[in-house]
Structures are given as structure tokens and as C-alpha cells.
Curated annotation (Swiss-Prot):
One of its GO terms (molecular function) is G protein-coupled receptor activity. This is Olfactory receptor 1M1. Its main location: membrane. Glycans are attached at residues 5, 89. The keyword Membrane applies. Residues 47-54, 119-142, 218-244, 293-313 are cytoplasmic. Expressed in testis. The gene is Or1m1. It comes from the Eukaryota. It is a multi-pass membrane protein. Odorant receptor. PROSITE patterns: G_PROTEIN_RECEP_F1_1, G_PROTEIN_RECEP_F1_2. Disulfide bonds join 97-179. GO terms for cellular component: membrane; plasma membrane.
Length: 313
């Protein structure tokens, strides 16, 4: 029997969203527009919250962090895909692949945890309005954001260290548009049991657990809203949560489908479609979801835009 060739791959080929070159111009134009909207939208949210003192509250502090994470999540994947399409060079070195994977998981975990933190913020605001400022103190807000940054760094680094021990021999084509964990594990010719177990543990910790916390928060919120005597009061209370619920549905609807569904029902096409949702579509839509229904944020955005126009003229 011939010994296997265990020379690890030095680079991978990202096959992208479509293997048909005819689709490239459309995909390039579409994702370039989406990325530009994502960058402008999220940076405007951050600037509006930073420069308007009326928005220096816990809710907007968490929103600014979410916008920063969304911007970074999209920047980690979309520009590389655009370069690959434009240059028709779809290769990525192994170190760059691991780096992209690290930041993808880092910002993805942050996104998940921040959305759960924002649900807790809404729970305190609606269920304990008189004690809101006491509970959501600057120290607690700092911890609710700072701890997830450290937590995300540790988990992402563990993923990379476990991945670095694997050997890739033979086929080096990834049926994806960025370096994601699951497609890479399929290419390994060594035992990936430890990696797969860690993926399941992390999925439970950073997807299932925050999602359960969100459901618990909104269960308490619904009970509190139902106790409000007037229909107008109930509508006003629920309107403060509607934007966040939309983001929850967008983000967790796709991530649960990718990381918690059995591998038997997952396909490369489904994985790529879900990845597009949470790396490109959701970061692009979040600024619109939060700003369209929020008068204070719309007012702050108008001030920034008007100031820019007056400065230019």
C-alpha cells in the first residue's frame, strides 16, 4: 500500500458564489453596492451616536458597538470576494485563510452576544423602568460589551489553534467565497473529531444560549406589555422592541440554519446563501432597521448629513 501524501496545502482556491464566469459582473456590482451601503450606513450610525449627547444612553451604546461589529464582519469577507472576482485570482494562502476565519468567528460571536445584550437592555427598560438607570450603569454596560470582546477573542483563537493542527492533502478547492470552518474541515485528511465537537460546543454557547436568553427576555417583556391597560401604551412599549426583533429574526434565522442543523440537510449552496445573509445582507439592513423607526436616531443622522452638506457648500 502506498503511503498517503500528507503535505499540507499552502493555499486554497475559493470557488466563490458561482463557478460560472458569466455571473461575475452581476455579482461584483451587487456586492460592491451592498458593501458601500453597509459601510456608509453603519459609520453614520456610529457618528450620529458619538456626536449627539442625547444618544449617550445604554441602548445606543450597544447599537454603536453592533454597527462597528457589522462593519467589520462585512469588511472581513466582502472586499476579498470582490478582489477575487475582479482579478479572477481565487487563491488565498493558508495563513490568510486562518486569519480571515479568525476574524469571521470573532465578529460573528460578538454580533450574537451583542444582540442578546440588547434584548436584556429592552427587558430592563420595559420591565423595570424606574430602576433602569441604576441597573444599566456605565460599569455594567462596559462589562456587557467588554467581556464579549475578550470571550470572542478566546473562542476564535481556540478555533484557529485546533485548525492549525490539521493536515490538508489533495483537493484544495473551497466551495465558498471566504474561509469558513465547515468547508475547511471537509477538506482535511486527518481526524477532525475534536474540531467538530468544539464547533458544537461553541454553537451552543454563542448561538443557542444567547437565543434562549433573548426568548426569555421577550417572554418577560410580553407579559409586562400585556399588563399595560391602554392599547396605545402597549403599542408604544412594543414599538421600542420591533427593530430589535427584526434583527434577531435576520441574524439567528440564518446562523441557526448553518451551525445547529444536522450536516445531512446542509449543502454548499445553502451554506453560501446563509453566509451571504449574515455577512452581507444583515450588516447592510441593520442601520435601516434601527433608524427608520427611531426619531431620535433619524434626527441625529439628519444633523450629520446637513452639517456635511453645509460644510461642502
Amino acid at each position: 500500500m502506498e503511503p498517503q501524501n500528507h503535505t499540507s496545502a499552502s493555499e486554497f482556491i475559493l470557488l466563490g458564489l458561482s463557478e460560472k464566469p458569466d455571473h461575475d459582473p452581476v455579482l461584483f456590482s451587487l456586492f460592491l453596492c451592498m458593501y458601500m451601503i453597509t459601510v456608509v450606513g453603519n459609520l453614520l450610525i456610529i457618528l450620529a451616536i458619538s456626536f449627539d449627547s442625547h444618544l449617550h444612553t445604554p441602548m445606543y451604546f450597544f447599537l454603536a458597538n453592533l454597527s462597528l461589529v457589522d462593519f467589520c464582519l462585512a469588511t472581513n469577507t466582502v472586499p476579498k470576494m470582490l478582489v477575487n472576482i475582479q482579478t479572477r485570482n481565487k487563491s488565498i494562502s493558508y495563513p490568510c485563510c486562518l486569519t480571515q476565519m479568525y476574524f469571521f468567528h470573532f465578529f460573528g460571536i460578538m454580533d450574537s452576544v451583542l444582540i442578546a445584550v440588547m434584548a436584556y437592555d429592552r427587558f430592563v427598560a420595559i420591565c423595570h423602568p424606574l430602576h433602569y438607570s441604576t441597573i444599566m450603569s456605565p460599569r455594567l454596560c462596559g462589562l456587557l460589551v467588554g467581556v464579549p470582546w475578550v470571550y470572542s477573542c478566546f473562542i476564535s483563537l481556540t478555533h484557529i489553534l485546533l485548525m492549525a493542527r490539521l493536515v490538508f492533502c489533495g483537493k484544495n478547492e473551497l466551495p465558498h467565497y471566504f474561509c469558513d470552518l465547515t468547508p475547511l474541515l471537509r477538506l482535511s485528511c486527518t481526524d477532525t473529531t475534536v474540531n467538530k465537537i468544539f464547533v458544537l460546543i461553541v454553537a451552543g454557547m454563542v448561538i443557542a444560549t444567547p437565543f434562549v436568553c433573548i426568548l426569555a427576555s421577550y417572554a418577560r417583556i410580553i407579559v409586562a406589555i400585556m399588563k399595560v391597560p391602554s392599547a396605545g401604551g402597549r403599542k408604544k412599549a412594543f414599538s421600542t422592541c420591533s427593530s430589535h426583533l427584526s434583527v434577531v429574526a435576520l441574524f439567528y434565522g440564518t446562523t441557526i440554519g448553518v451551525y445547529l442543523c444536522p450536516s445531512s440537510v446542509r449543502t454548499a449552496v445553502k451554506e453560501k446563501a446563509s453566509a451571504v445573509m449574515y455577512t452581507a445582507v444583515t450588516p447592510m439592513l441593520n442601520p435601516f432597521i434601527y433608524s427608520l423607526r427611531n426619531r431620535d436616531l433619524k434626527g441625529a443622522l439628519k444633523k450629520i448629513i446637513n452639517r456635511k452638506i453645509s460644510t461642502s457648500s
